[in-house]
Design a protein with these regions (language model features):
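Conserved Walker A/P-loop ATP-binding site and its immediately adjacent core
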Residues: 124-130
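Peripheral, non-AAA+ core regions of ATP-driven protein-machinery
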Residues: 2-13, 17-79, 86-94, 99-106, ...
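Conserved RecA-like ASCE P-loop NTPase motor core of nucleic-acid helicases/translocases
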Residues: 119-123
Length: 453
């Protein structure tokens, strides 16, 4: 029975509650993030918890025999999740509209039904016929996939309790609502309470739940920031919706590393895995072009070869223009200052445009040397040998510092046919002395420049 209504102000960034509007949120210190919502006071006499009453147990008394991970049928997704799908986990998948979130999860459902696992796909945005049309494009599905078009969480909870599926997909969290809350679906309170209920279902019934979340124009999942704190895993689907590639990146993972990425290619029949992203990223690289160099970055345990492009030209403006796509803008400015001070290049009057080809975002310090040499190549209009690869971190004194996993990077370069590696001299040891490829160790940026020119 509804007793009455009251007005509460929520912070859209962190979910902080207040009885009055505030200019600055006391929780996250952000400005102008409070929104007004009307909340009903409801007697929850019939409400019951999903969890059963339990007693504390010792750590040694917990068995993990039945807690093996499920295979999603997609190696790239399993890599990002840390080795497979963990039972009872709550996974949030975010990304721009049209990037392929629903397609990815529908393909996961197909793979799980091929393993005879019971899967429930709940959509709040599409009709059953529309889901069938998308599924037909992907391929044949097993008989253990069940569809439900519903946004009422109480109905969804009863359906899950009745079916007892192994995996549930919620598409999307912004369309779900709880009747006890009077605010509209997608509001701060609805998203937070909906996620809380789904978390109870996942943990109480040991069911894996995938949640699709829309992102804002700033690139974060719409709703309170606390949403990301509540779930076990947060995955972001990145990439240009007009391009063929997609990058799945783990931002939070309680059951694995957050450094891994998965690479997919968008095709007519759905998403295809890219098992060798280095070859994929270097496809179409121009020959005999200055300002282009191949660098190696590590994403978790996987080495990825990328093309770094630089265009340096005289500026007609009072303040030269600097642009960086795919890497940190401030890092590029820092490296240009190092070149001007330590290598004697006059870049203060030049426009600079730096790009990571393929649209992938890389911020690992090991690509510093690649950015440095691409800038020098464009500035001096000298072509770097296409069979040369570089990696290394650059300090403010111009020194080339050590990086991790040098051996894996060299092996990846050799596998793809590169003949020369320019890397930090401090990384030279018995493990990195690999036959069949020329290794050039450098101590500073001056030595690196002499090695390529």
């Amino acid at each position: 029975m509804v007793k009455g209504k009251k007005t509460i102000y929520f912070c859209q960034n962190c979910g902080y509650e207040s009885g009055k509007w505030m200019g600055q949120c006391p929780g996250c210190k952000e400005w102008n993030t409070f929104v007004e919502e009307t909340v009903s006071k409801t007697e929850r006499t019939n409400a019951r918890s999903i969890r059963e009453e339990k007693s504390p147990v010792t750590l040694s008394g917990i068995s993990l025999e039945d807690e093996s991970r499920m295979n999603s049928g997609m190696k790239e997704l399993d890599r990002v999740l840390g080795g497979g799908i963990v039972r009872g986990s709550l996974v949030l998948v975010g990304g721009d509209p049209g990037i392929g979130k629903s397609t990815l999860l529908l393909q996961v459902c197909r793979n799980l039904t091929d393993q005879k696992r019971k899967v429930l796909y709940i959509s709040g945005e599409e009709s059953l016929a529309q889901i069938k049309m998308r599924a037909k494009r992907i391929g044949e599905f097993g008989e253990s996939l069940y569809l439900l078009c519903e946004t009422n969480l109480e109905v969804i909870r009863k359906a899950i309790e009745k079916m007892r599926p192994e995996v549930v997909v919620i598409d999307s969290i912004q369309t779900m609502y709880q009747e006890e809350i009077s605010s509209a679906p997608g509001s701060v309170s609805q998203v937070r309470e909906s996620t809380s209920i789904l978390m109870q279902i996942a943990k109480g019934m040991n069911i894996t739940i995938f949640i699709v979340g829309h992102v804002t124009k700033e690139g974060v999942v719409a709703g309170p920031r606390v949403l990301e704190h509540m779930v076990d895993t947060v995955l972001y689907f990145e990439g240009d919706r007009h391009a063929v590639y997609r990058i799945l990146r783990g931002v939070k993972n309680r059951f694995g590393s957050t450094n891994e990425i998965g690479v997919f290619e968008m095709r007519t029949e759905g998403l295809a895995e890219v098992e060798n992203p280095s070859e994929f990223m270097l496809n179409g690289r121009p020959e005999d072009a200055s300002g282009s160099v191949v660098a190696c970055s590590m994403e978790g345990t996987r080495p990825i070869l990328i093309e770094i492009q630089a265009l340096i030209c005289q500026s007609n403006l009072g303040i030269p223009r600097r642009t960086a796509a795919g890497t940190d803008y401030n890092r590029v400015n820092l490296l240009m200052a190092v070149l001007e001070k330590r290598a004697g290049l006059h870049l203060s009057s030049c426009d600079a445009y730096i790009n990571i080809a393929g649209g992938i975002k890389m911020n690992e310090p090991a690509i510093d040397l690649g950015i440095i040499l691409a800038i020098v190549s464009s500035y001096k209009d000298k072509v770097i040998d296409e069979k040369t690869i570089v990696f290394g971190e650059v300090g403010l004194s111009g020194e080339v510092r050590a990086i991790s996993m040098a051996e894996q990077r060299i092996m990846e370069a050799k596998k793809l046919g590169f003949q020369r590696v320019i890397y930090p001299k401090v990384c030279e040891n018995e493990r990195t002395r690999i036959k069949g490829i020329e290794l050039v160790g450098v101590s500073n940026v001056r030595e690196a420049i002499r090695a390529i020119l």
